[in-house]
């Protein structure tokens, strides 16, 4: 019998990863805005993602819709436990989206919209990190009902992961701008990105050390045999790709810094999945316990398998059409 729950969790996991990468670098551009005061530089930065930024968020919608369709218990429980940070994240996304469009229309109030774009980008990343940290720490449930407090999500660890996601997005943004720009803006990114990579490596290390120490079940999953043998390449590869990303910046490579950062994101995400598997509401509810009826999963899976190739095609097409570098004075992006 086909395990529809496993198929759905793979779809959702891949969708979330694509969202983190695609929306990560365009959120990173807003996070990097304070490093640049000139309007021309900021225009170029925004133009690198103007044709694709709203499409990038499609993957967040796909992940949320997938949870609702295939794992309704997760949707209701996680939403109840993380209601406030999710709402604040959505508000920040709205501010950022409005600022993105209004900044080019209202020259008189451009400074205000710049600040809204910066604030919306930083807060979106921060609250996504808060949600991640709270999820890793676990969600208190009894018979499928959330039984924790309204502020259980707010802990030093979740704040730290919030900062970590902001740094992650800024690093992706640096890599994207190195690839998509040239001249002075690109040179500045070569200076900023190594600092971001080092900060990101430190954050990855702290989270990797804290998580197994605070959660014995996660430590057992990583450090018992044969898992230890299978998973030991993950931290080694993190070291390797961190070094290669730093070297690529020093050698002024254009695509490599972004690709090595992408590899670090995939490795960190892999570690996250390994730590929690098979629990979808950590630390007690597995994907099979939280699953919708098979008939519901099958019906929605058919729709997803029809829709996902279309999303992939138009996403790939938009990136292909706007594949060239963006320079000062380029028009047609708005």
Tell me what each language-model feature is.
Residues 1-55, 61-64:
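N-terminal signal-anchor module of multipass membrane proteins
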Residues 1-12, 66-83, 136-156:
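Helix-coil boundary and interhelical linker segments in multi-pass alpha-helical membrane proteins
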Residues 2-5, 32-33, 37-50, 287-289, ...:
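Extramembrane terminal tails and long inter-domain/linker segments of multi-pass membrane proteins
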Residues 8-19, 79-91, 118-123, 152-166, ...:
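Alpha-helical transmembrane segments
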Residues 52-122, 142, 220-229:
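Membrane-interface helix-loop-helix modules in multi-pass inner-membrane proteins
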Residues 102-253:
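Long, contiguous internal "core" modules enriched in hydrophobic/ aromatic residues
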Residues 258-266:
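Central hydrophobic cores of alpha-helical transmembrane segments
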Residues 281-300:
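Short, membrane-exposed interhelical loops at transmembrane-helix boundaries
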């Amino acid at each position: 019998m086909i395990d529809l729950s496993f198929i759905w969790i793979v779809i959702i996991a891949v969708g979330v990863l694509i969202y983190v990468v695609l929306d990560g670098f365009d959120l990173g551009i807003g996070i990097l805005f304070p490093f640049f005061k000139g309007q021309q530089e900021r225009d170029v930065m925004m133009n690198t993602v103007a044709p694709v930024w709203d499409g990038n968020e499609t993957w967040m919608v796909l992940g949320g819709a997938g949870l609702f369709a295939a794992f309704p218990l997760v949707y209701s429980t996680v939403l109840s436990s993380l209601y406030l940070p999710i709402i604040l994240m959505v508000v920040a996304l709205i501010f950022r989206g409005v600022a993105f469009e209004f900044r080019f229309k209202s020259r008189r109030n451009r400074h205000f919209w710049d600040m809204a774009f910066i604030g919306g980008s930083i807060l979106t990343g921060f609250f996504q990190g808060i949600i991640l940290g709270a999820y890793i720490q676990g969600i208190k449930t009894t018979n499928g009902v959330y039984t924790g407090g309204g502020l259980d999500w707010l802990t030093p660890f979740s704040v730290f992961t919030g900062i970590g996601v902001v740094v992650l997005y800024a690093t992706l943004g640096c890599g994207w701008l190195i690839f998509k720009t040239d001249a002075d803006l690109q040179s500045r990114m070569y200076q900023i990105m190594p600092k971001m990579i080092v900060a990101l490596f430190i954050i990855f290390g702290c989270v990797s050390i804290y998580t197994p120490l605070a959660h014995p079940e996660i430590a057992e999953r990583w450090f018992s045999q044969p898992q230890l043998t299978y998973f030991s390449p993950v931290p080694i590869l993190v070291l390797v790709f961190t070094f290669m990303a730093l070297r690529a910046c020093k050698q002024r490579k254009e695509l490599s810094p972004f690709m090595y950062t992408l590899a670090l994101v995939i490795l960190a995400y892999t570690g996250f999945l390994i730590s929690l598997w098979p629990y979808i509401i950590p630390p007690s509810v597995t994907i099979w316990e939280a699953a919708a009826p098979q008939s519901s999963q099958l019906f929605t899976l058919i729709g997803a398998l029809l829709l996902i190739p279309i999303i992939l095609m138009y996403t790939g097409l938009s990136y292909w059409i706007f594949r060239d570098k963006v320079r000062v004075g380029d028009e047609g992006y708005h």
